[in-house]
Amino acid sequence: MSPLREVVSVFLRLGVVAFGGPAAHIAMMREELVRRRRWVSDAQFIDLLGLTNLIPGPNSTEMAIHLGYLRAGAWGLVLGGICFIVPAMLIVMALAWAYVRWGGLPVATGVLYGVKPVIIAIVLQAMWGLARTAVRGPLLAGAFVVAAALALAGVHELLVLFGAGGVAALVVPRRRAVAGAVAALAWATPARVMAAAAVAGGVTLGTMTLVFLKIGAVLYGSGYVLLAFLRADFVERLGWLTDRQLLDAVAVGQVTPGPVFTTATFIGFLLAGWTGAVLATVAIFLPSFVFVAASRPLLPRLRGARRAAAFLDGVNVAALGLMAAVTWQLGRAAVVDPLTAALALAAAVLLVRTRVNSVWLLAAGGALGLAWRALHA
């Protein structure tokens, strides 16, 4: 199989089975592309993860774009991202059609009941493997712990990441660094797009597209941050959605596989049908392709300068700290009784002791969840 066809095959499959949000997506990519296929080493994977945390946009999608480029060049960059996004987009479009047609959402509580604890095990296993590579010495270990604590305390993700990078950079001997270029890249384009999208009025495809383009270009952080942006624009400023419609859209984005940014697909369908769904999806994801392509030349320079390399090391462990905080928060919601605790423990043991594909664990968890719900209906 050619590298490009391999990129298409891998990311189409991940786009179908990658439930659980960015942390779980990244864990699955590590298992498939580091452990199984050996496209990159753990050190390279962590560097890419650190770089995606410094630019706006959905981290897991940007990892797919980066990894596609490493495997198959420019076309791999484009198709890696597209193939990861398209399955989720099609699923969300189908759910949006059903929502409009019947005024409600298909019930998936049984599947999610069994899938969520398996996702927690997958994320923990990946985080352990990445931490063994990234956390080198007491300074970086301390940065990991502090980053996790700050994230749990509600400190903004961007402050945690740049703070950890800055502290790590300050403790190495003075050398010329290029870390400032990352910050410039992260803020220059979003400022222009934000200004361009500051328009209001009736529901028009142009206005909707510009709003989603702005969100994709400036948004750091979790799905909760996405919810805040969407509410400010579509509920409060433009008045195009109700709070209930927005919450339903976010729920669909969270329970379907692939990037949670496909919430935009659902909203686009509600506002302008099939055309709106496609335009909203393209607009919110397009900045990620631009940022990844623009930031790729920075990675060798970041690793080539000692201070900049230390900055990236700090960002990497802070990203893992954020991942730990998210896993703790998700785990409290996922492991709710003895059965879900047993599912999480069994999945963790299988992941550590065997090379079982996480897709089979997710399928087993979903089937057990459906059976349990059927017995207790």
Where are these regions (language model features)?
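Multi-pass membrane proteins that catalyze or facilitate reactions on polyprenyl-/lipid-phosphate substrates
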Residues: 1-55, 66-256, 260-377
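Conserved beta-loop-alpha segment that forms the PLP phosphate-binding cup at the N-terminus of a helix
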Residues: 59-62
